[in-house]
Amino acid sequence: MNRLRRSDGEQTYAAILETAVRLASIEGLSTLTLGRLAEEAGVSKSGLYAHFGSKQQLELDIIQAARDIFEREVIQPALAADEGLPQLEQICASYLSYIERRVFPGGCFFAGMLAEFDARSGTAAHDAVASDQQGWTELLESFAAVARERGQLKRSTDVPQLVFDLTAAVELANYYHVLFGNPKVLDRARTAIDTAIAANRP
């Protein structure tokens, strides 16, 4: 019976988080109130407190849930590719696919969080989002560095600059795709990615 209750509790927690991530991707994380989430998830505010304890913990759990989805949709396909340039190309392709399929209804969750929390230093949510963005940059740089070491890119390739260019392409595609709903921006991003990589091929 205790195990059944824990299972029910875990299912409720997962369902609440699914709703919370969806709402946060559209409406923002900091503005998501417990009352709004309780209404949308069909639970009481006291029930939410039983699962999260505080607004800060709710925010951190939402970020973790979104992180898990992002890793599954974008990072894992890249890690499964051959090392070096194939991984760099795959992670860009996976990101654009994840945008195109609207895995999060409000577009890339983390791009939205960057815009929301970039100037709100000192909060746990800001620190978590900043850490994720740094980790994302370092991952792409590691793929590009291996590609350079293996001769897939020029030895003169400026890895941080290349990654900056690729990140700019995919993140701008995300913003424009959400704002205008025009799938052509994804093709423009693919062209920008191909051009940036081609300029660094040996």
Q: What residues fall within each predicted segment?
A:
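Amphipathic alpha-helical packing segments from all-alpha helical-bundle domains
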Residues: 71, 105, 122-149, 161-164
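Hydrophobic alpha-helical connector segments
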Residues: 61, 75-106, 159-166
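Amphipathic alpha-helical segments enriched in hydrophobic/aromatic and basic residues
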Residues: 24-27, 33-34, 45, 55, ...
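Amphipathic alpha-helical segments used for helix-helix packing
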Residues: 87, 101-124
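C-terminal peripheral helix-coil segments that are non-catalytic and often amphipathic
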Residues: 1-3, 90-98, 134-150, 169-172, ...
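Basic, helix-initiating cap at the start of DNA-binding domains
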Residues: 1-27, 31-40, 57-60
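Short hydrophobic/aromatic patch on the recognition helix
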Residues: 41-52
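Hydrophobic alpha-helical segments that form the core
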Residues: 106, 111, 155-176, 191-196
